[in-house]
C-alpha cells in the first residue's frame, strides 16, 4: 500500500498514477468506492500545476442527477472546452466521472473528439464498468485494486472486520457504510438472525417488512450498499452450505457459520444462494426494485 496526498491506494495503482505526465486519454478502472475520482482530481491538479477550483483549464463532467446518464450534450460542451486555448497551463484537463454512464451516442461523439484532439488534451475517464471497445482501445488503462484488511488497518483506526469484508477492501465504500444511518447495525442484526435461525431478529432490524413502512430501507440506503449486503449474504449462505456438507471454510466476520448451519436444510441453503445470486444479477442489470428486495427478504426469513 502507498498513499497519494494522504489517500491510500494499492502500490501498483500509485506507481501507474505517478507515470501520468503527458496529454492523452486515461481510463481509471475499478470498483465503486475505491478512490478513482479523488485520484483523478489529484492527477489533474498535478498536471495543471494549480488548484482545480475555478480553474479555466479544468472541466469535470458527471451524470445529471435527473437522468443519471451522461449525454451527447455534455460531450458537445467538451468539444467547446477543448477547442479553446489553455489559459494558464500547457494543455487542458477533463475528468469524466461515472464515464460508464455515457450513452452510446455520447461515447461515439467522444471517440470523434479523441481522434481530433489526440496529444492536445488530458482526458481521464473514471469508470466502474467497461466502455465501448473503440473508446477503451484509445485509453491507457490504470486499474485500481482493493486493499487487504491489514492495509486498511494502517489508515482506519479501530477497523471493523465485518465492514471491511462488506466493503471489499475499498476505503471510500467502508466510510460510506459507517456513515450510512444504521446500515452496519442492520447487517449485524441480519447475521444474528441467520446464526440463530430466528425470524424475529430480521423482522425487528428490517421493520420495513411491515407493509406500512415498506419503503424505508430501500430509500435510506443507496443501491451499492444494498448490493454489498446481498453479495455478503450470498457468501454467508454459501459458507453455511459448505459447512452443512462437511467442508471446511475460512472465518466469516459477524457470524458463527457452523452454528448457523444447524438451522437450515441443504435444500433451503441452496435455494437461498440461488435467490441471492439472482438478486445480485438483477441489481447489476438495473432491474432490482423494492418489491424484489422484500420478496428476497421474506424468502430468506422463511
Task: List where the protein language model places each region.
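Charged, glycine-rich active-site and insertion segments that engage polyanionic ligands
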Residues: 1-49, 120-121, 127-232, 236-302
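Conserved catalytic/switch belt of AAA+ P-loop NTPases
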Residues: 108-124
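Short, surface-exposed loop and linker segments with low hydrophobicity and enrichment for Pro/Ser/Thr
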Residues: 102, 111-114, 220, 224
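Clamp-loader machinery-focused feature within the broader ASCE/P-loop NTPase space
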Residues: 1-105, 112
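Conserved SAM-binding loop
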Residues: 95, 124-125
Amino acid at each position: 500500500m502507498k498513499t497519494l496526498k494522504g489517500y491510500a491506494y494499492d502500490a501498483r495503482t500509485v506507481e501507474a498514477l505517478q507515470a501520468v505526465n503527458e496529454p492523452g486519454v486515461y481510463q481509471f478502472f475499478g470498483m465503486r468506492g475505491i478512490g478513482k475520482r479523488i485520484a483523478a482530481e489529484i492527477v489533474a491538479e498535478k498536471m495543471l500545476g494549480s488548484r482545480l477550483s475555478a480553474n479555466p483549464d479544468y472541466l469535470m463532467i458527471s451524470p445529471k442527477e435527473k437522468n443519471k446518464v451522461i449525454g451527447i450534450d455534455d460531450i458537445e460542451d467538451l468539444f467547446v472546452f477543448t477547442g479553446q486555448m489553455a489559459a494558464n497551463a500547457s494543455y487542458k484537463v477533463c475528468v469524466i466521472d461515472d464515464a460508464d454512464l455515457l450513452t452510446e451516442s455520447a461515447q461515439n461523439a467522444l471517440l470523434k473528439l479523441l481522434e481530433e484532439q489526440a496529444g492536445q488534451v488530458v482526458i481521464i475517464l473514471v469508470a466502474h464498468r467497461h466502455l465501448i471497445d473503440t473508446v477503451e482501445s484509445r485509453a491507457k488503462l490504470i486499474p485500481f485494486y482493493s486493499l487487504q484488511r491489514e492495509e486498511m488497518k494502517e489508515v482506519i483506526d479501530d477497523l471493523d472486520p465485518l465492514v471491511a469484508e462488506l466493503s471489499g477492501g475499498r476505503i471510500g465504500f467502508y466510510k460510506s457504510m459507517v456513515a450510512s444511518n444504521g446500515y452496519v447495525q442492520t447487517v449485524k442484526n441480519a447475521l444474528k438472525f441467520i446464526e440463530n435461525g430466528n425470524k424475529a431478529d430480521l423482522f425487528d432490524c428490517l421493520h420495513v417488512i411491515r407493509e406500512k413502512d415498506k419503503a424505508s430501507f430501500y430509500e435510506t440506503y443507496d443501491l451499492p450498499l444494498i448490493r454489498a449486503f446481498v453479495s455478503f449474504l450470498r457468501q454467508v449462505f454459501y459458507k453455511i452450505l459448505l459447512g452443512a456438507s462437511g467442508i471446511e471454510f475460512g472465518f466469516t466476520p459477524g457470524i458463527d457459520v457452523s452454528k448457523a448451519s444447524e438451522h437450515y436444510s441443504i435444500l433451503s441453503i441452496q435455494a437461498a444462494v440461488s435467490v441471492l445470486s439472482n438478486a445480485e444479477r438483477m441489481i447489476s442489470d438495473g432491474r432490482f426494485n423494492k418489491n424484489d428486495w422484500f420478496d428476497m427478504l421474506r424468502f430468506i426469513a422463511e
